[in-house]
């Protein structure tokens, strides 16, 4: 049994070698010749999986170690009798922590408290729900918009997008990319929406590049609209609008979900799905794969305020480390993908062990996802 895996999927060789012969290959472009005798294909979002790639090939199963699936033609796979699995929620925590790192940086730079801001969350799936929970744990007001969930009657106080635009100081997008249909998200943030944002608002896109109309956004910024922008995703990736990058406050190369934990979850989820597909079901404990974190433990004295939270968050991950490298190589062919391929190891907040002498600080840090304990000062 031959299994092709994206060369940037951590732990893929280690896990899939339990099931057969493993060949690691580039994801963009994928070497088509390798598909001629392969039984399974494990990809990331950079690989377009469709009829033109797989027609006439012996592939029986496709797995994507990503939450999103807009790069996969699921309907064609089903029609062709090819098994499929994604990894929903695998990088949700990573994306939430990316958003927090960005917001805390902007709050420090511009001198505002997040408690004074209302956050509008567009898309309330695995990422949106977790973001809502962590923001509300801090006492930050949130507004939710998710028309598909609202129409299904899912639990939640869902508002219209117009309401979020009118009332939110921060608007952050966490939707799939739907190019048509009743829940179309292509250019959901169009020129009209962008121009309607509150003066000084913050716009964040960490889902799919085309959810925000990049051309319209650049036009508004060039005209002097007072707006802070965080973009992790771009229309036309791996190409991007260099002029837009110059205008945004934070720009990164589609790495919001790139924690070691998130990547490992993606790999293990598709590994477990494929092992079940072939009748050799196996389960993997994530902590048996992950290395020890860089920081063993730290001690926190007193209450948890915003500056202290910012220091803790940026101790684990400061978004500026990914902004600067992209600006240096923007516009150079191949460099966007190279940054992603050679991405420095990044951990989640849970890797940081925090000893607190204040019980409320320990409790709040646990709600936020840190590994915190209370030890009263002696």
Swiss-Prot record:
It catalyses: 4-phospho-D-erythronate + NAD(+) = (R)-3-hydroxy-2-oxo-4-phosphooxybutanoate + NADH + H(+). Its EC number is 1.1.1.290. CDD domains: ErythrP_dh. SUPFAM superfamilies: Formate/glycerate dehydrogenase catalytic domain-like, NAD(P)-binding Rossmann-fold domains. NAD(+) binds at residues 146, 175, 232, 257. NCBIfam families: PRK00257.1 (NF001309), PRK15438.1 (NF011966). Catalyzes the oxidation of erythronate-4-phosphate to 3-hydroxy-2-oxo-4-phosphonooxybutanoate. This is Erythronate-4-phosphate dehydrogenase.
């Amino acid at each position: 049994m031959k299994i092709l895996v994206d060369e940037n999927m951590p732990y893929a060789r280690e896990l899939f070698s339990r099931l057969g012969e493993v060949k690691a290959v580039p994801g963009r472009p994928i070497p088509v010749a390798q598909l001629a005798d392969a039984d399974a294909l494990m990809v990331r979002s950079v690989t377009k999986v469709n009829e033109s790639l797989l027609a006439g090939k012996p592939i029986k199963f496709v797995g994507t170690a990503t939450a999103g699936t807009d790069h996969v033609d699921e309907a064609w796979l089903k029609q062709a009798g090819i098994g499929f699995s994604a990894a929903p929620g695998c990088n949700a925590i990573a994306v939430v922590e990316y958003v927090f790192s960005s917001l805390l940086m902007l709050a420090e730079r511009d001198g505002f408290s997040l408690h004074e801001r209302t956050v509008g969350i567009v898309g309330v799936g695995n990422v949106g729900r977790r973001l809502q929970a962590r923001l509300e744990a801090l006492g930050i007001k949130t507004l939710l918009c998710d028309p598909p969930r609202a129409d299904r009657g899912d639990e939640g106080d869902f508002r219209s997008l117009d309401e979020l635009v009118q009332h939110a100081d921060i608007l952050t997008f966490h939707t799939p990319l739907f190019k048509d249909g009743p829940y179309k998200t292509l250019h959901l943030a169009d020129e009209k929406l962008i121009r309607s944002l509150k003066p000084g608002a913050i716009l964040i896109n960490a889902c799919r590049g085309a959810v925000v109309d990049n051309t319209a956004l650049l036009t508004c910024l060039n005209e002097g609209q007072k707006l802070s922008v965080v973009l992790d995703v771009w229309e036309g990736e791996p190409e991007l609008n260099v002029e837009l990058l110059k205008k945004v406050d934070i720009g990164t190369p589609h790495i919001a979900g790139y924690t070691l934990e998130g990547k490992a979850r993606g790999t293990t989820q598709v590994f477990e799905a494929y092992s079940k597909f072939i009748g050799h079901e196996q389960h993997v404990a994530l902590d048996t794969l992950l290395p020890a974190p860089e920081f063993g433990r730290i001690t926190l004295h007193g209450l948890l305020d915003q500056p202290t939270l910012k220091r803790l968050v940026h101790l684990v991950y400061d978004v500026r480390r990914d902004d600067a490298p992209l600006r240096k190589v923007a516009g150079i062919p191949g460099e966007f993908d190279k940054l992603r391929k050679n991405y420095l190891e990044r951990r989640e907040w849970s890797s940081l062990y925090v000893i607190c002498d204040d019980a409320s600080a320990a409790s709040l840090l646990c709600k936020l996802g840190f590994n915190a304990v209370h030890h009263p000062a002696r």
